[in-house]
Amino acid sequence: DPVAVAQASLAFTQQAAQATMDLGRKFLSGLGIGGGSGPAALPGGRVRGPQAVEYVIARGGSQRGVPYSWGGGAINGPSTGVDQDAGKVGYDCSGFTRYAFAGVGVQIPKYSGDQYEVGRHIAPSQAKRGDLIFYGPGGSQHVAIYLGNGQMLESSSAAGQVTVSPLRTAGMTPYLTRIIET
């Protein structure tokens, strides 16, 4: 029964997402960030602390080498893409950033243009590790995680995988977005 299979798959995905959120909360609690109920929340679903930023970067970095797949990625890991990448498991840029931030209990939207609007806008000169870098009008074309020292972590269609790349300024939006305050 296809409906039963779809319902079972949805239930499993929800359980996996909850387990991911619980692990992130447990990790942050062990660092003294937030309580057992979750990380220290700020308005707009943001959390505080340099440890949270480092966890997001470490979680994202653990996916280096995972294939790029347009439309792929979820809060619990890589997933099949859509259109030309249907059947290919991996991340697109926004699915990747969504996965990285879910580890600290922050759910950001799937679409990069919506992610651009979630946090606090920061001038590039004030960028810190963990800020999101966007490209295209309203952040609609690409998103990456700023690492500092002119580097970013991204799921790159050009590289075909999750990778560390030199920061590109061509086409960058006027602001980065800060989700986690340090």
What are the roles of these predicted feature ranges?
Residues 13, 46-53, 86-94, 120, ...:
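Solvent-exposed, acidic/flexible segments
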Residues 113-122, 136-141, 147-182:
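Aromatic- and glycine-rich peptidoglycan recognition patches
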Residues 1-69, 179-182:
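Intrinsically disordered, low-complexity
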